[in-house]
Amino acid sequence: MGKKVLAVVKLALPAGKATPAPPVGPALGQYGVNLVMFTKEYNAKTADQIGLIIPAQITIYEDKSYSFILKTPPASVLLKRAAQIEKGSNNGTIVASITQEQLQQIALTKLPDLNTKDVKKAMSIISGTAANMGIQIL
């Protein structure tokens, strides 16, 4: 029989730069997880994606061991990076634009975490996020 799961914690952390300070410390410390070991593992697995926010789903077991799964970065982070902007628009005003090729690349990156396997549908989902952020698709 497998290990008994104590909790599942979801965190969005900067790639390669996680520290035992908040939000990691309070979220995992209450379950007795070795914070230094977790941050070292997380930083090692995300070292090639520095500058992005990488969500992690951490499963904590009763013996205080853990496992974690890395997800793809949020679409908004990928869109801001492609459009080379710091912040999207909050009122629908066009603040930047990206090409269809950039949109397709973002959709391919996000495909494992989306509820579709079709690239065209994934592009549609991402373009909706882009429109809400004030990013125009050329």
From Swiss-Prot:
Q: Which UniProt keywords apply?
A: Chloroplast, Plastid, Ribonucleoprotein, Ribosomal protein, RNA-binding, rRNA-binding
Q: Could you cite one Gene Ontology molecular function of this protein?
A: structural constituent of ribosome
Q: Where is it located? A: Plastid, Chloroplast
- Tell me the SMART domains matching this sequence: RL11 (SM00649)
Kindly list the GO CC terms recorded for this protein.
chloroplast; cytosolic large ribosomal subunit
Gene Ontology BP annotations: translation
Assembly and binders:
Part of the ribosomal stalk of the 50S ribosomal subunit. Interacts with L10 and the large rRNA to form the base of the stalk. L10 forms an elongated spine to which L12 dimers bind in a sequential fashion forming a multimeric L10(L12)X complex.
Function statement: Forms part of the ribosomal stalk which helps the ribosome interact with GTP-bound translation factors.
UniProt record similarity statement: Belongs to the universal ribosomal protein uL11 family.
- Would you tell me the protein name for this molecule? Large ribosomal subunit protein uL11c
Write the gene name: rpl11
